[in-house]
Curated annotation (Swiss-Prot):
The keyword Electron transport applies. Belongs to the PetN family. Keywords: Electron transport, Membrane, Photosynthesis, Thylakoid, Transmembrane, Transmembrane helix, Transport. The 4 large subunits of the cytochrome b6-f complex are cytochrome b6, subunit IV (17 kDa polypeptide, PetD), cytochrome f and the Rieske protein, while the 4 small subunits are PetG, PetL, PetM and PetN. The complex functions as a dimer. It is found in: Cellular thylakoid membrane. It comes from Microcystis aeruginosa (strain NIES-843 / IAM M-2473). GO terms for cellular component: cytochrome b6f complex; plasma membrane-derived thylakoid membrane. This is Cytochrome b6-f complex subunit 8. Its main location: membrane. It is a single-pass membrane protein.
């Protein structure tokens, strides 16, 4: 895996995690 692929994976993971936290926050509170 090269650095560009690793960068895209980390960005997508962070984006997915932030959306999941927003949805969980709305459902939790």
């Amino acid at each position: 895996m090269d650095i560009l692929t690793l960068g895209w994976v980390s960005i997508l993971a962070l984006f997915t995690w932030s959306i999941a936290m927003v949805v969980w926050g709305r459902n939790g509170f």
